[in-house]
């Protein structure tokens, strides 16, 4: 429990209505000298934003997330199946939680997941992954227009720009935050 006056942007709180991320906090003076805390909250499982007012001395339950290491196994229907490496339980994570991270997934990739009350709320990929090139442009096709790079399709289906010496079958290191080529492995 924390005082509402200690809330800050980015914190998660748990209320009777659900789990929320604090998106803004402001202190407001009341009519009789009492102050209250005006907070904008975004539901953790949707984009719905609500505003709540708390007395400055009111206690609020801070949500304590657990970070778990998961290994990707495979796609089943609309969910991604992961193995929790801590307790060896299988977890299904829906597409909405994965967002665009699924573009980098292949069997065996280890990710970090934020879990609250045994529900996964976010998944973070490693910053760098090694993926195999499954298709590339011919060097002459795009080099003259793009300054010495060509398109490459990776084994997961994502397309990146690579130097002309990268060929089909090469394994390359990719920055998952920017989707950029780093080096040939």
UniProtKB/Swiss-Prot annotation:
Cross-referenced Pfam families: EFP (PF01132), EFP_N (PF08207), Elong-fact-P_C (PF09285)
GO cellular component: cytoplasm
Pathway(s) where this gene product acts: Protein biosynthesis; polypeptide chain elongation
Residue pairs linked by disulfide bridges in the UniProt entry: none
Location within or outside the cell: Cytoplasm
Keyword Manganese on entry: no
Lineage, opening ranks: Bacteria, Pseudomonadati, Chlamydiota, Chlamydiia, Chlamydiales
GO molecular function per UniProt: translation elongation factor activity
A biological process term (GO) from this entry: peptide biosynthetic process
NCBIfam families: PRK12426.1
The keyword Metal-binding is annotated on this UniProt entry: no
Primary residence: cytoplasm
Record protein name field: Elongation factor P 1
Xref: Gene3D superfamilies: 2.30.30.30, Nucleic acid-binding proteins (2.40.50.140)
